[in-house]
Amino acid sequence: SGFQLSSYDMTTIGWGCAPEVQFKMNEEYSFMSGEFVWTGFDYLGEPTPYYSDWPSHSSLFGIIDLAGIPKDRYYLYRSHWNKDVETLHILPHWNWEGREGEVTPVFVYTNYPTAELFINGKSQGKRTKDLSVTVHNSGDSLSTANFKRQKRYRLMWMDTKYEPGTVKVIAYDKDGNAVAEKEMKTAGKPYRIELTADRDKIMADGKDLSFVTVKIVDKDGNLCPTAANEITFKVKGKGYYRAGANGDPTSLESFQAPHMKVFSGMMTAIVSSTEEPGKITLEATSKGLKKATLVIESGK
């Protein structure tokens, strides 16, 4: 709805396939040397499948969105591509006012084989990746309808019902040992702005950039995933506001203007240095929210 695609990531384009199809082919076919994904990073243009639906104007199938923020599918790829980094990611978010008691599936992307899901302390059971799935036994229409290939790489609880509170997952290794856990909570009302720079020290060359992740969080620091507040930015000192993006493929807001609405509670603000070294102060404000200030150092 709203010219967006679901975070469950079950939609594929006509000239492509689901990530799991390629994963499994690479594993089974020794003549395949690698994998090509279009695209890693969303870009302006080709708003598949909303080609003619205004105001859609950027791609939706990237692993990372237009603001440089990883999508849920990023963690699916990482769980398979990079076994050296622990991945334990829960989706979707858990703010679904009006869906109380309705079936709301929960997916977990992880590099571990098994996980157990809890909603408000009640176990929803364990799921284990189905290693029996092959390219040849999972391509028929019934297997596709039952998401058979997905069960090889995703842990899916398809019958969970939404209730506000805490979603928790415990991951287990191949020997059955609990090795990791993660929680996600229903966020309260938007309370403050949170700023996090990818680098707090940049070069004073008039070109270097600091990419700042902007979040709207509640009093307890939980991301507010449905927030759409407009943030206004001011930069003081030896730098200036370069651009911003929120990852919304339907947003027509200017990238250069020092104000923008967050999308799903987040956006990215970009601060540039000047050729004069010193402190750069980024201030973010929004009506009804506690403001945030971030200091970045620039030097030669």
Locate each region found by the language model:
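Edge beta-strands of extracellular beta-sandwich domains
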Residues: 176-188, 290-299
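Short, hydrophobic beta-strand segments
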Residues: 150, 155-162, 254-275
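Low-complexity "stalk/linker" and mucin-like segments enriched in Ser/Thr/Pro/Ala/Gly
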Residues: 135-147, 238-264
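Short, solvent-exposed loop/linker segments at the N-terminal edge
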Residues: 96-101, 201-210
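Beta-strand-rich structural segments
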Residues: 106-110, 170-171, 196, 207-225, ...
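Short flexible loop/turn segments that cap and initiate beta-strands
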Residues: 111, 117-129, 181-183, 209, ...
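Extended substrate-binding grooves/exosites of carbohydrate-active enzymes
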Residues: 1-178
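Extracellular Ig-like/FN3 beta-sandwich strand-entry sites
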Residues: 162-166, 209, 277-279
